[in-house]
């Protein structure tokens, strides 16, 4: 009987974490639930199904990075990153050696998390640079480019996992018809190696579950002591990894102990669908950002809240463009204002926004006369006479 051990890990991982361990999912409330950590995202953004790299997550991440390099939050964040690297390497080597789709897929998933973390840190460093003569609008789009690259890589990986899993599932269900296609992936029966060393594969998955659960408990304890929302979200993500690892462990156990080799490629197909969905949604969001789509509501709220708390000045916000690193705010000023008054007002608005949002490296403020055609066009697009005004206006969440 053909026992093709081809599973793809993390079958039920409802959210391949696109957004980085460090940029782990934030919730507006203080209570984080597992469903918030594992609901699928985006990265359509994050899907919100998860808005990958959501602006709120990026703003929180920058706040964390502003702290001392030896802060407990950053220590645990880096520990989580290192654990992903180690688990990805161990599962990848084990999956290839044992011809196990579950381990290979799990390793690919872990690698996706790691790449997202690394790209986030790298692009954050680039985006934090001040505008230059060559790049007067700043380097904010580097984050979008990095997201698009990693998302595209995950889409490609998911397609490869799906192709391998479907081929092996077909071989198991139709052994005679599939025998002529056994050259796809590997030329020998992968189940042989697995069934000779079953506890090696099970041990790798079990070890990852234990490590992730330990990280969850350790991270949650520090998060509660330091009142860190981003660290608490990260803790629940470790718990979600541990729970989904248990599903992979059950799939591996069923394949071996119940003599059900179809479980391996079947779960591999499920994982590939989840990874593809997350990658596609993240790519879509990044692509739309490159086309200068309007910023997310959470970023717009962050800007308007900053201005509401600032000095009361005679202007209205016409529109907000950009992302969490570089922003363009267009305001309308009274027609009686001179060019010098408008320029001074714009500088005050710019300083207020930059002081309130540490993630921003660039904020361009353009003042327009309230009776100008440009303002009327923007108001028509926004469907209102202005987003917010000073000094008399209301703002609700």
UniProtKB/Swiss-Prot annotation:
Keywords, comma-separated and alphabetical: Ion transport, Membrane, Transmembrane, Transmembrane helix, Transport
GO molecular function: iron ion transmembrane transporter activity; monoatomic cation transmembrane transporter activity
Pfam families documented for this protein: Cation_efflux (PF01545)
Cellular-component GO terms for this entry: membrane; mitochondrial inner membrane
Membrane topology of the entry: Multi-pass membrane protein
Domain of life: Eukaryota
GO biological process: inorganic ion homeostasis; intracellular monoatomic cation homeostasis; iron import into the mitochondrion
Principal location listed in the UniProt entry: membrane
Listed transmembrane segments: 142-162, 191-211, 242-258, 260-280
Subcellular location: Membrane
Family according to the record: Belongs to the cation diffusion facilitator (CDF) transporter (TC 2.A.4) family. SLC30A subfamily.
Protein name as annotated: Uncharacterized metal transporter C1020.03
Source species of the chain: Schizosaccharomyces pombe (strain 972 / ATCC 24843) (Fission yeast)
């Amino acid at each position: 009987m053909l026992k093709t051990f081809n599973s793809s890990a993390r079958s039920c991982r409802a959210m391949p974490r696109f957004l980085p361990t460090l940029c782990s999912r934030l919730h507006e409330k203080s209570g984080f639930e597992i469903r918030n950590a594992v609901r699928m995202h985006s990265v359509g953004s994050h899907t919100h199904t998860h808005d990958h790299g959501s602006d709120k997550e990026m703003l929180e991440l920058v706040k964390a990075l502003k702290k001392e390099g030896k802060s407990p939050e950053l220590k645990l964040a880096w520990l989580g990153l290192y654990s992903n690297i180690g688990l990805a390497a161990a599962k990848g080597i084990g999956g290839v050696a044992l011809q196990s789709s579950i381990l290979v897929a799990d390793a690919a998933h872990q690698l996706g998390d790691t790449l997202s973390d690394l790209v986030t840190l790298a692009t954050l460093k680039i985006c934090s640079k001040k505008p230059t003569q060559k790049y007067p609008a700043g380097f904010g789009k580097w984050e979008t480019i990095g997201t698009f690259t990693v998302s595209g890589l995950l889409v490609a990986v998911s397609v490869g996992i799906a192709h391998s899993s479907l081929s092996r599932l077909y071989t198991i269900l139709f052994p005679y018809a599939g025998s002529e296609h056994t050259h796809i992936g590997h030329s020998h029966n992968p189940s042989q190696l697995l069934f000779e060393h079953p506890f090696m594969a099970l041990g790798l998955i079990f070890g990852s579950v234990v490590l992730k659960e330990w990280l969850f408990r350790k991270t949650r304890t520090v998060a509660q002591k330091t009142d860190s929302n981003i660290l608490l979200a990260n803790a629940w993500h470790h718990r979600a990894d541990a729970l989904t690892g248990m599903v992979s462990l059950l799939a591996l156990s069923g394949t071996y102990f119940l003599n059900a080799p179809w479980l391996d490629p079947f779960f591999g197909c499920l994982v590939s669908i989840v990874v593809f969905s997350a990658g596609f949604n993240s790519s879509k969001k990044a692509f739309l950002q490159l086309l200068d789509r309007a910023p997310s509501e959470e970023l717009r709220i962050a800007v308007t809240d900053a201005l509401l708390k600032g000095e009361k000045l005679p202007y209205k916000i016409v529109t907000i463009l950009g992302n969490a690193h570089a922003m363009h705010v267009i305001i309308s000023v009274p027609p009686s204002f001179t060019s010098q008054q408008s320029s001074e007002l714009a500088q005050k608005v710019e300083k207020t926004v930059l002081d309130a949002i540490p993630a921003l490296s660039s904020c361009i403020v353009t003042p327009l006369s309230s009776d100008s055609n440009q303002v009327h066009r923007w108001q028509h697009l926004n469907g209102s006479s202005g987003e917010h005004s000073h000094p008399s206006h209301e703002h609700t969440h």
